[in-house]
């Protein structure tokens, strides 16, 4: 990892799915209906199909204005690379603009252009779908999660039209003036990287040959091949975090692309292997928590490293955010979920 940590840059989903019981009728769930508006412009209608109001966090989800991953795109059963951002957000003190409330039967709509976050200039047949768990909140704190899933939408993409869509994320001009990270932020990030190395190495050992019940708890299998894969990703994270002058990623201690908000801790641009911290990474998070399943600077950095394909390919997604959502995933989903790795490392460190 190259530790540039600049003020301006120079290089090119929650908890407790069972914590929201339905009193009567349908269990809490969001249904996502995907349809094609025009070529690569897609509309999602998100409907509360349960019997109670749901207040959910729409960061990394529909209604998020940032270029986040809202759907998965497939060509001939192979997923296409995502070229937007993946962000980690706070679990407490969420501001109202991060929350959406849906009454039973109520829905919201979101239109977005999939060509803005994936290269579709080849055109042809594309299949689109999404599923996972979205965080729910009570009193501005994440207190659970609900599942969501969509229909499978197949479309024919006009190559020329898709190529004309501007990319949502562009590499920054290399001529941009550089201002190096220093002072307390530099010190905090250096400490976080050292802690990340320790956490990832310990997690790698635990994944490879530690408690099978703990591994089952987080990754929903005790398969030796899966344990080896998880251990390999953790070792790759430890290796990447151990150097500030080499590696596959570039890590900034400030908001390189302007995607931070009052709720976002850090984000990754997987297409460029760039990671950036936000202001609240330093003000909201402790260096290393002593609480099981809690967030801190080290596990946030570890979480972001798992998103970067340059560290270990393929990079992870955000399919379940927080302990209960992450542990509700299937084994294949958990293997591809950033927070599962952060939570497992936290559990190994604190013997949760």
From Swiss-Prot:
Location(s) in or outside the cell: Secreted
Signal peptide: 1-19
Catalytic residues of the enzyme: 304
GO molecular function terms listed in the Swiss-Prot or TrEMBL record: metal ion binding; metalloendopeptidase activity
Cofactor remark from the record: Binds 1 zinc ion per subunit.
Propeptide section residues: 20-175
Keyword terms: Cleavage on pair of basic residues, Disulfide bond, Hydrolase, Metal-binding, Metalloprotease, Protease, Secreted, Signal, Zinc, Zymogen
Organism listed in the record: Aspergillus terreus (strain NIH 2624 / FGSC A1156)
Entry's Gene Ontology BP terms: proteolysis
CDD domains: M35_deuterolysin_like (cd11008)
Enzyme Commission number(s) of this protein: 3.4.24.39
A Pfam cross-reference name: Peptidase_M35
Location (main, coarse): secreted
Positions that bind Zn(2+): 303, 307, 318
SS bond list: 181-253, 260-278
InterPro entries: Fungal_M35_metalloproteases (IPR050414), Lys_MEP (IPR029463), MetalloPept_cat_dom_sf (IPR024079), Peptidase_M35 (IPR001384)
Catalytic reactions of this protein: Preferential cleavage of bonds with hydrophobic residues in P1'. Also 3-Asn-|-Gln-4 and 8-Gly-|-Ser-9 bonds in insulin B chain
Cofactor(s) required for function per UniProt: Zn(2+)
Protein's UniProt name: Neutral protease 2 homolog ATEG_04941
Function, as annotated: Secreted metalloproteinase that allows assimilation of proteinaceous substrates. Shows high activities on basic nuclear substrates such as histone and protamine.
């Amino acid at each position: 990892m190259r530790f540039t940590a600049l003020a301006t840059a120079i290089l090119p989903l929650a908890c407790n799915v069972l914590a929201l019981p339905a009193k009567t009728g349908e269990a809490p769930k969001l249904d996502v209906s995907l349809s094609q508006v025009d070529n690569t412009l897609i509309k999602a209608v998100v409907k509360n199909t349960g019997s109670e109001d749901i207040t959910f966090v729409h960061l990394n989800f529909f209604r998020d204005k940032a270029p986040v991953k809202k759907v998965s795109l497939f060509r001939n059963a192979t997923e296409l690379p995502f070229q937007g951002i993946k962000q980690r957000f706070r679990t407490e003190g969420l501001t109202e603009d991060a929350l959406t409330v849906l009454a039973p039967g109520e829905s919201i709509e979101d239109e977005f252009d999939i060509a803005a976050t994936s290269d579709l200039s080849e055109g042809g047949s594309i299949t689109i779908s999404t599923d996972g768990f979205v965080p729910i909140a009570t009193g501005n704190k994440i207190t659970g999660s609900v599942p969501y899933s969509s229909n499978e939408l197949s479309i024919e993409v006009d190559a020329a039209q898709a190529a004309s869509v501007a990319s949502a994320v562009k590499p920054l001009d290399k001529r941009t003036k550089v201002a190096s990270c220093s002072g307390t932020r530099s010190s905090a990030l250096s400490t976080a990287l050292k802690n990340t190395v320790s956490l990832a190495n310990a997690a790698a050992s635990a994944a490879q040959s530690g408690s099978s019940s703990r591994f089952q708890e987080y990754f929903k299998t005790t398969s030796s091949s899966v344990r080896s894969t998880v251990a390999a990703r953790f070792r790759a994270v430890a290796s990447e975090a151990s150097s500030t002058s080499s590696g596959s990623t570039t890590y900034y201690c400030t908001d390189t692309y302007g995607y931070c908000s009052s709720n976002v801790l850090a984000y990754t641009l997987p297409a460029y292997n760039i990671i950036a911290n936000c202001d609240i990474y330093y003000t909201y998070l402790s260096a290393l928590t002593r609480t099981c399943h809690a967030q801190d600077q080290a596990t946030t950095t570890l979480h972001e490293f798992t998103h970067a394909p340059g560290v270990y390919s393929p990079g992870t997604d955000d399919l379940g955010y927080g302990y209960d959502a992450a542990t509700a995933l299937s084994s294949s989903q958990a293997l591809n979920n950033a927070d599962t790795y952060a939570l497992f490392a936290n559990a190994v460190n604190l013997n949760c």
